[in-house]
Amino acid sequence: MNFGETIERVKTRSYIARRANWDDDMFIFAQIPANINEETIPKMQSLPEVVKREITEAGFTSLSYQNQICKFDNGVITYFTPTGNEIFADDWETKSDDTLAK
């Protein structure tokens, strides 16, 4: 499957991977969009205290996580930016609800 086809699958909450080149525990997924309310912001572990203060002092009462493409690699989640080789590769696989597609 090519990269364009797999990105369309990511939009449907599937994950994508290149099993020929990557470890079995590495894959790409889209974070589910979320709205974070005012009560949750101070409790967020993913934001530094100074950032939480800036957000609340600026008067924001909610945060919105949108369109974040993430890479899971051996228990660590980071952002994903594809390389040229990954964009042009035809060996992508997708998985959704335990169904593998190549």
Predicted segments, located by residue:
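Extended non-catalytic interaction/regulatory regions in multidomain proteins
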Residues: 1-72
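Short, compact, well-ordered microdomains
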Residues: 62-102
